[in-house]
Amino acid sequence: MSTAQKAKILQLIDSCCQNAKSTQLKSLSFVIGAVNGTTKEAKRTYIQEQCEFLEKLRQQKIREGRINILSMDAGVSNFAFSKMQLLNNDPLPKVLDWQKINLEEKFFQNLKKLSLNPAETSELVFNLTEYLFESMPIPDMFTIERQRTRTMSSRHILDPILKVNILEQILFSNLENKMKYTNKIPNTSKLRYMVCSSDPHRMTSYWCIPREETPTSSKKLKSNKHSKDSRIKLVKKILSTSILEGNSTSSTKLVEFIGVWNNRIRNALTKKKSFKLCDILEIQDNSGVRKDDDLADSFLHCLSWMEWLKNYESITELLNSKTLVKTQFGQVFEFCENKVQKLKFLQNTYNND
Amino acid sequence: MSTAQKAKILQLIDSCCQNAKSTQLKSLSFVIGAVNGTTKEAKRTYIQEQCEFLEKLRQQKIREGRINILSMDAGVSNFAFSKMQLLNNDPLPKVLDWQKINLEEKFFQNLKKLSLNPAETSELVFNLTEYLFESMPIPDMFTIERQRTRTMSSRHILDPILKVNILEQILFSNLENKMKYTNKIPNTSKLRYMVCSSDPHRMTSYWCIPREETPTSSKKLKSNKHSKDSRIKLVKKILSTSILEGNSTSSTKLVEFIGVWNNRIRNALTKKKSFKLCDILEIQDNSGVRKDDDLADSFLHCLSWMEWLKNYESITELLNSKTLVKTQFGQVFEFCENKVQKLKFLQNTYNND
């Protein structure tokens, strides 16, 4: 990876931010998935941090001609992940894999419940880590949804939340260490991927831009249940649009489904209007609870990173163009503002359907 | 490791337990550090589980001529570990290493506090894992004190306890995975160690056998603070006895200190009667709080495993002897009862000093 190139582009972006208004910095942070800092200074620092990641992905995509991202939403009985690929000249990412697993069923054959005994968690998460490498291609980036450590109401943490935090942390560490130890093996192809936490808040705010808040709507909008349902609804819309709209340049089409996925979604659509995501994945969730939210979230995390990377690529192209620097900076913030409007348009279209 | 040999000895021990009284099974569980089951059936199962571990250690010791155990008490600012070695024909284990580390100081150069950001915990615990392999010999077993997941009074879990649970779990997993991945490297010497959780309750009850409970004493005895102080006091006694009693067969001598340790303990003893364990390790704990309890606990965990292994070896010798089976079984429980009495004598001697 060319460090000089990276330093140059990060420097260009920071110069672009130097004299920008706070609202401009906010929209730039939004379209690349950066934390939105409370001060201009903090906004610039967070923008640089996120660009650091995205620049690595951009250069890997140039090198390999494509980028593969696997995004996970960790849970013991509901572990969901989605894997997508973006080719160099394709406008839309393709869905390669999308699964929900009951970890106790898959790795303990339901013979035991996952206790907090470190020997058991170590064994289970090692097998899960190896499972994520079974299907090719190996991702260039693994993202794991960042778990909250607080129960909504109290400053304490409950057992199930402790368990999923431990699962998230060991998985993150295992993925990094597998690369460190495997790359010590001489004469073998080196593993080269990134592991990164994905913030559920930034994912949610990218896809559900709060409309002008009316007193009643904002309370309802913020309820956890409502936010989950709206994300599931959004993913179903993205799926149906992807199948029904053949032409991949239409603005409301965000992702491609290939092969088996195409038929499954078509079947689910034709069978009944209100299908479940679990139906598409043909999940016989014998635990009875056919939850869709983990599937929706893992899908949206993956799609967010693809969107943030594409937006970042557009920004770097503007900054590498031959036009005057001042014009470039103006074009960058214009691009960001347009992107925000497009997303609002998309959400309105989907909500009005 | 000869599986047949292992199966044979485990079978012999179970036959020995088959017709034993509950009190006999209790003393056998006690001297080998097994969980004390509530029923005879449960006692036998837990005895077998513990013997499985100890048999692996015993065979490794026969093969290598010695056994090295490294025991840890995890904490972010107070990470303590103790490493001991037991040679085949030596009656007492030797202390090879004994440290307390402030993890943020050592691995983050105090530049940042350990947040629960998985990227930071992964980086810190990887460096800690590698650090544990820096000094030779590589242990045959790593034990990590099992952390409680509950705050004493409430059914909830507080942040610091979440952090130390995550530290314990990632460390356990890292140690196991380092071996799995490293052993995939062709033509390199294989890593061969065990990783096991060490139960603080079993350690504490081995060294602080509750005297006949009087109403007042039992409440005081059970207070967490009192139990910690008595363990620190016990370790100081073990240290001073080890130095002052040259002859290693005296019943109150439990461990050998060699080289630099000898002088440090002697200096600490001569300087002032009430020395701190931190003084011996020359820890300038600039955090101001020179806590001794982590040092004491890591020491006692390690010494417990050495004691449980030695007791297990004595039991297997009795069961492998030429005498009548019935007599062997009687001798086993006699040995256990004597061991319990010796420990009570030791504690009384120490407490009366």
Swiss-Prot record, chains A, B:
GO terms for biological process: mitochondrial genome maintenance. GO terms for molecular function: crossed form four-way junction DNA binding; DNA endonuclease activity; flap-structured DNA binding; metal ion binding; Y-form DNA binding. It catalyses: Endonucleolytic cleavage at a junction such as a reciprocal single-stranded crossover between two homologous DNA duplexes (Holliday junction). It is found in: Mitochondrion. It comes from the Eukaryota. GO terms for cellular component: mitochondrial inner membrane; mitochondrion. Its cofactor is Mg(2+). Keywords: Endonuclease, Hydrolase, Magnesium, Metal-binding, Mitochondrion, Nuclease, Transit peptide. Mg(2+) binds at residues 293-294. Changing residue 294 to N: >200-fold decrease in activity. Its EC number is 3.1.21.10. Gene3D superfamilies: Ribonuclease H-like superfamily/Ribonuclease H. It holds the Pfam family Ydc2-catalyt. Capable of resolving Holliday junctions. Specific for 4-way junctions. Seems to be important for the maintenance of mitochondrial DNA. Cleaves fixed junctions at the point of strand exchange. Cleaves after 5'-CT-3' sequence. Homodimer. This is Cruciform cutting endonuclease 1, mitochondrial. It comes from Saccharomyces cerevisiae (strain ATCC 204508 / S288c).
